Amino acid sequence: MVFVNSRHQGNHYEQMAADYLRRQGLTLVTQNVNYRFGELDLIMRDGNTLVFVEVRYRNNTQHGHAAETVTRTKRARLIKAANCWMLANKMNSHSADFRFDVIAIHQQGQHIDWLKNAITEG
C-alpha cells in the first residue's frame, strides 16, 4: 500500500490496531489525543481497565521488532500524556485501573503483536 504521507500511514495502522483490539473485546474510548509533548494513539477499555495503546509499525523485522522503537523518552511522554488525559477526565493514576499496551504491526498488517502492560511507570 502506498501512503501520501506518514500521518496517513499512521492513521491507517492505528485504525488497523483499533479494529484488531475490538475483535479481542476492547472498546474504543478515543484516539489521536495530542498534547504539545506527546500523543496518545488509542485509548480503549478492557472491562474496567483503561488501556493506553501505542501503535508501532515496521515493514519488516530485519532491523528489529516494531515494539523496540518505543524508547525511554517515548515511554515518559506517553505516561505524561496519559496522566494529563486522566486529569482532564476527572481520573488519576491512584484511583483509575489502567495500563499501557503496545500494538506492533509488521509486514503491512499481516503480523500484529499485542504486548499488554508493555510500558510500566518508574
From Swiss-Prot:
Pfam families assigned: UPF0102
SUPFAM superfamilies associated with the record: Restriction endonuclease-like
Gene3D superfamilies reported for this sequence: 3.40.1350.10
Listed InterPro entries: Restrct_endonuc-II-like, tRNA_endonuc-like_dom_sf, UPF0102_YraN-like
UniProt-recorded Gene Ontology molecular function terms: nucleic acid binding
Domain of life, per lineage: Bacteria
PANTHER family: UPF0102 PROTEIN YRAN
Family classification: Belongs to the UPF0102 family.
Name of the protein in its database record: UPF0102 protein VC_0580
